[in-house]
């Protein structure tokens, strides 16, 4: 596995934009299927189990992660770890389920979620059609979950105290990370004086294509960095195309998302929709994308719609589109952004921005015809529901989504900008 440096920091840039004409369809992507065909359930008990047993009842449970990794699991099977117990090492999932019958890893019994700690990655998925749920993955040297396969679903986990909560490698595609708690993943994998190579502190790292990150809570992706002072991101995309980051609540991360790619690769067509982004960090930033003038760009056809952002730090930023920004680099619609510093930055021809609400000390971009600079009237610092009289009400245009972050219907006309529809 290659750990890619982030090559930051983008503070208050002056660079050039690329003209964006984004026609990306904004319909929510489908999740990887969950298993529908019944198979065998195997139990794992760290205290009373034995790998020599059948594993098919709690009384005959297996004991170790290695036993699970070596088992000939089939489509529709389930591996259940006993609640209140912990394992050290890597759970290796190399077999594959099918589109109609995933292999499931979960929990049984009562008490706290089963814990896996230590190891390079606490869970490593190289197979396809797995569902991993209800585990806590903590203190891993790299990732809570690393996915190299396809059509896998990670749901209902807690990943904390790792370099990255969930990492999807360059071979990983059509995976879903959903309804999980990715908390205080605040370790750096590279952190040394000089240069421009520090890396780490990610909630989710996407090096693959066509993945969905949705309905998660991502907090505390933040760490000290020799190169940048501080670093970290809720969702980092590097060499990943057509990923969808939607319906997430994020708090106190250094950056919500930053995009880049290696020479000869791409990070195109990524969509950010209906996310709530709050942070008290001084340099917190919502979104960073690059044009062709950057060695990490261009990040073509990036789309940000209906995000609500509140970053009160004096040097906090909304969106940054630099080194040749243009309408085919970044399209923004229906975003509500309040920051202590600059709300948006563009150079070059400029981003395709409209129907937004902005509040901040600086606005270094051309405001769209239906955008406005005004107080968004959020309910609170982290509760970004709009209050009565908010300029976001009725400002939004259709963006292809039928419900908001609360699951409330989005009307075909007169929608509220931001992640939440106004509810009188």
Question: Which role does the model predict for each range below?
Answer:
Residues 46-82, 86-87, 406, 410-411, ...:
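Acidic Gly/Asp/Thr-rich repetitive segments characteristic of extracellular carbohydrate-active
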């Amino acid at each position: 596995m290659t750990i890619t440096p982030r090559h930051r920091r983008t503070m208050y840039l002056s660079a050039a934009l690329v003209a964006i004409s984004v026609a990306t369809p904004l319909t929510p992507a489908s999740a990887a299927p969950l298993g529908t065909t019944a198979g065998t359930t195997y139990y794992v008990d760290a205290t009373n189990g034995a790998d020599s047993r059948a594993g098919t009842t709690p009384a005959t449970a297996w004991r170790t992660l290695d036993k699970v990794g070596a088992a000939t699991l089939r489509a529709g099977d389930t591996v259940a770890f006993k609640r209140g117990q912990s394992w050290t090492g890597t759970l290796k999932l190399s077999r594959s389920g099918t589109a109609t019958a995933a292999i499931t890893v979960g929990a049984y019994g009562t008490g706290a979620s089963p814990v896996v700690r230590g190891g390079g990655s606490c869970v490593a998925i190289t197979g396809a059609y797995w569902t991993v749920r209800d585990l806590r993955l903590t203190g891993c040297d790299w990732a809570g979950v690393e996915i190299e396969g396809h059509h896998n679903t990670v749901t209902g986990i807690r990943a904390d105290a790792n370099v990255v909560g969930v990492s999807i490698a360059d071979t990983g595609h059509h995976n879903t990370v959903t309804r999980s708690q990715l908390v205080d993943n605040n370790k750096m994998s590279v952190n040394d004086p000089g240069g421009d190579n520090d890396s780490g502190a990610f909630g989710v790292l996407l090096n693959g294509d066509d993945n969905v990150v949705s309905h998660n809570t991502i907090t505390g992706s933040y760490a000290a960095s020799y190169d940048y002072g501080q670093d970290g991101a809720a969702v980092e995309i590097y060499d990943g195309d057509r990923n969808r980051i939607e319906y997430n609540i994020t708090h106190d991360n250094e950056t919500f998302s930053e995009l880049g790619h290696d020479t000869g690769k791409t990070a195109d067509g990524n969509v950010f929709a209906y996310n709530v982004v709050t942070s008290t960090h001084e340099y917190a930033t919502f979104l960073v994308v690059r044009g062709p003038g950057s060695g990490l760009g261009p990040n073509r056809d990036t789309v940000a719609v209906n995000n609500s952002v509140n970053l009160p730090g004096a040097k906090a930023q909304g969106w940054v589109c630099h080194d040749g920004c243009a309408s085919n680099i970044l399209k923004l619609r229906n975003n509500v952004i309040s920051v202590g510093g600059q709300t948006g930055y563009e150079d070059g021809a400029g981003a395709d921005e409209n129907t937004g609400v902005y509040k901040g000390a600086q606005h270094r971009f051309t405001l769209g015809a239906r955008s406005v600079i005004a107080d968004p009237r959020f309910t609170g610092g982290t509760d970004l529901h709009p209050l009565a009289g908010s300029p976001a009400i009725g400002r939004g245009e259709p963006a292809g989504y039928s419900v908001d972050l609360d699951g409330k219907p989005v009307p075909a006309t007169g929608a509220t900008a931001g992640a939440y529809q106004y509810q009188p």
